């Protein structure tokens, strides 16, 4: 990254550190499958593992050469001292049905190391899938999967359920009537999952057989605090200082939800057994370029039982550049009226279908109703008989890869690719003794 910063400064020495950071964001792309990846309220894809992705040096230099320096940074801070208890054992499996006994209506659970139900899942019917050691043949769309621990890893069980269409998984122990464990090796599981005791699981499975209308939901019992913000800014960094007294601070999950609905995980379940967090400062970039005005929600969940804590104080600091934004969409009203003639656009939308959100167009000072998509294709040799075709794509578009070997022959379709981002690629075997020609055809949205 430091080398890329040097390249940017080489073509535009007037760039500030904020300019360089935003250039890195604007030129980045996601290259790894990660279920945590979401588009934030400004349309920028982000996950908690690699942030906005890997910057493209060529695009960064191109953007830097015509970059408009950012306005001065403004910081708005908000403080509160709620002094409230953090509910113990906040991970709960909710069970509803006319035959559900009271002790099974709100079951204490443990969880994975990956995706969490920061918002409650849908209340769904469940399918008892037994131990699950191979792919699930039935369609679980619109359902949750009830699975017993054993033989296969947690990660494989959850993946099989996700492949079958399940929205979430409940895994119950196969040994020890009351034990709850954290499900290791599940950092990249594609759907949320809870773990419950053998006693609760065995009883639920029998109840499911008697009551086909039974429904379940993954939820969290958290302490929540709301900050109402009236300042209109384009968001950059966000800082949250948390002052809490908890016996094992690693049990706490701390999240921040922006007015756009984007959730940042500031702290996840871990093995830190110290007290706190005592006046810890957490920062997130997940909300870059979102509007700041509206409701910001802090949630703190105790994800393990038996230890209790108190939330004493919070301080939220929003950093960004002020704009006039009466409709709170992250687009400056004068810019929006100039290009759209009204205030009916949104920052998340891609009005000209060129792969760039209106918020990105505003950042780069390009026209949001005129496509800026420039098709480029690169041919990258991987070894002596394998090539990678890579091209600038539009998200969601389907591309045909055409190939022609030698001269005077009819080109044939080698395959199709549906793009999920601003770049797509295709690997191909070639004969190094023959000439080969390739063409990419954009077939548009399916």
Name each model-derived stretch.
Residues 69, 73-79, 219-324:
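Loop and turn regions of beta-sandwich accessory domains that flank beta-strands and are enriched
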Residues 4, 24, 51, 145, ...:
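Residue-level detector of buried hydrophobic side-chain packing
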Residues 51-84, 352-374:
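Catalytic cores of secreted or luminal carbohydrate-active enzymes
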Residues 323-446:
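Short, composition-biased motifs enriched in small/polar/acidic residues
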Residues 67-82, 221-231, 372-394:
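Surface beta-strand/loop "capping" patches
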Residues 1-50, 54, 157-183:
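Hydrolase catalytic cores
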Residues 47-48, 65-66, 71-224:
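Structured lumen-facing ectodomains of secretory-pathway proteins
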Residues 9, 14, 28-32, 150-152, ...:
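Acidic glycine-/aspartate-rich tracts in secreted/extracellular proteins
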């Amino acid at each position: 990254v430091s080398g890329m910063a040097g390249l940017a400064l080489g073509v535009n020495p007037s760039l500030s550190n904020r300019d360089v950071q935003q250039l890195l964001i604007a030129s980045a792309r996601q290259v790894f499958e990660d279920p945590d990846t979401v588009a934030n309220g400004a349309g920028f894809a982000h996950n908690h593992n690699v942030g906005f992705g890997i910057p493209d040096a060529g695009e960064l230099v191109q953007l830097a050469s015509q970059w408009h320096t950012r306005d001065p940074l403004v910081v708005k801070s908000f403080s509160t001292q709620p002094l409230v208890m953090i509910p113990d054992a906040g991970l709960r499996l909710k069970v509803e049905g006319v035959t559900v006994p009271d002790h099974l209506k709100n079951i204490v659970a443990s969880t994975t190391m990956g995706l969490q139900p920061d918002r409650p899942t849908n209340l769904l019917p469940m399918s008892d899938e037994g131990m699950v050691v191979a792919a699930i043949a039935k369609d679980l769309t619109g359902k949750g999967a009830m699975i017993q621990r054993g033989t296969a890893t947690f990660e494989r069980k959850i993946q099989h359920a996700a492949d079958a269409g399940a929205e979430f998984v409940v895994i119950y122990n196969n040994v020890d009537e009351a034990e709850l464990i954290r499900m290791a090796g599940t950092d990249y599981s594609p759907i949320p999952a809870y773990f419950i005791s053998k006693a609760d699981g065995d009883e639920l499975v029998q109840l499911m057989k008697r009551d086909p209308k039974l429904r379940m939901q993954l939820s969290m019992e958290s302490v929540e605090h709301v900050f109402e913000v009236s300042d209109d800014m384009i968001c950059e960094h966000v800082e949250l200082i948390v002052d809490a007294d908890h016996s094992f601070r690693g049990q706490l999950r701390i999240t921040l939800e922006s007015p756009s609905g984007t959730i940042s995980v500031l702290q996840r379940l871990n093995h830190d057994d110290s007290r706190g967090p005592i006046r810890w400062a957490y920062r997130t970039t997940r909300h870059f370029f979102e509007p700041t005005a509206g409701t910001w929600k802090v949630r703190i969940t105790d994800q393990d039982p038996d230890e209790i804590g108190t939330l004493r104080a919070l301080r939220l600091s929003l950093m960004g550049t002020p704009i006039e934004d009466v409709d709170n969409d992250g687009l400056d009203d004068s810019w929006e009226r100039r290009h759209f003639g009204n205030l009916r656009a949104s920052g998340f939308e891609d009005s000209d279908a060129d792969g760039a959100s209106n918020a990105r167009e505003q950042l780069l000072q390009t026209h949001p109703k005129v496509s800026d998509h420039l098709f480029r294709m690169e041919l990258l040799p991987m070894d002596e008989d394998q090539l990678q075709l890579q091209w600038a794509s539009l998200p969601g578009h389907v591309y045909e890869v055409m190939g022609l070997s030698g001269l005077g022959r009819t080109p044939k379709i080698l395959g199709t690719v549906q793009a999920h981002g601003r770049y797509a690629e295709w690997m191909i075997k070639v004969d190094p003794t023959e000439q080969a020609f390739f063409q990419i055809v954009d077939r548009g949205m399916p």
